[in-house]
Amino acid sequence: MTTILDLLGKDADYLLNHQCIIKKEALTLPSGDFVSRVFAESDRNNRVLRSLQQMFDHGRLGGSGYLSILPVDQGVEHTAGASFAKNPMYFDPENIVRLAIESGCSAVASSYGVLSILARRYAHKIPFLLKLNHNELLSYPTTYHQIFFSQVEDAYNMGAVAVGATVYFGSESSNEEIVSVAKAFSRARELGLATVLWCYLRNPHFTRNGVDYHTAADLTGQADHLGATLGADIVKQKLPTLQEGFKTINFSKTDDLVYSELSSNHPIDLCRYQVLNSYCGKVGLINSGGPSSGQNDFTEAAKTAVINKRAGGMGLILGRKAFQRPFSEGVQLLNLIQDIYLDPTISIS
């Protein structure tokens, strides 16, 4: 049987024994009583606290303070053909929800169409997270603009416990998206729903000399900070891969201490800088799993989970690596990352 150490390979010591520049004592870390410790002191009403607790109590990670969410909104974001051609069973929304249930996920996140058509059968069996806005890829030339496909009331009526939305920070449409998401999240809180923000960057100028800074820790960290400012209970972010986006692109403001005293080039330090920007962990950071690369998916997923956990993150929201493979293997992959969060020997750095 392949172990986590086998999957980490030569990177095992590098990832499992690293000590972060920012000490964990400076952070609010995930735990079974996270909702009571953090959000009970906030302005969230009792119904929001209950909704959050439902996600934290559900699935294999229930009671741990960590989340394993299956997101399948790629049929809109990346087109259904590109997303499901490798595994056509997922054109049927029921198999999406079945995968989340059978793999013991904390919640399933998807579009209004997917969740609404199954709500009466499954909303009481697994927490629903309704993704409110999307970027559709049927416009030509391709544009990037998150528009609302559904409303907060739709989530409430179908029995969802949470809503999600994306803001493309740095894009031409970001100001409009910020305003619309702020209104939606305010309404969600009134109705007792938890809120998750996809804090993504989108700007052609964020690529310089062939290097893509959309995953720079300083830029993504600021996006997380803006997401927390919008009142998100949880922020979703891509795993950072490099640093010094602000300095290289030469825009906005930063400080040399960000790079010398608050982070390093180690992936766990880069991710910890994201956690730092998420109100020192008071707003949970979940990282995305990224695209499927085929045979390396298990190794990549294991490394991502180890980095997120050891950095002080709250879990993974992983989709394509799980559903773009046979059903049983998808369950196995999701269980793998859950095992990492449940493993007491993989400690927070």
UniProtKB/Swiss-Prot annotation:
Catalytic activity from the UniProt record: beta-D-fructose 1,6-bisphosphate = D-glyceraldehyde 3-phosphate + dihydroxyacetone phosphate
Top-level taxon: Bacteria
InterPro entries assigned to the protein according to its UniProt record, in alphabetical order: Aldolase_TIM, DeoC/FbaB/LacD_aldolase, DeoC/FbaB_aldolase, FbaB-like
One of the Pfam families matching this protein, by short name: DeoC
Keyword list, A-Z: Cytoplasm, Glycolysis, Lyase, Schiff base
Protein's cellular compartments: Cytoplasm
A Gene Ontology biological process term: glycolytic process
MF-aspect GO terms: fructose-bisphosphate aldolase activity
Group of enzyme by EC: lyase
Keyword Cytoplasm listed: yes
EC number(s) reported in the record: 4.1.2.13
The family this protein is said to belong to: Belongs to the DeoC/FbaB aldolase family. FbaB subfamily.
Name by which UniProt lists this protein: Probable fructose-bisphosphate aldolase class 1
Natural source organism: Chlamydia muridarum (strain MoPn / Nigg)
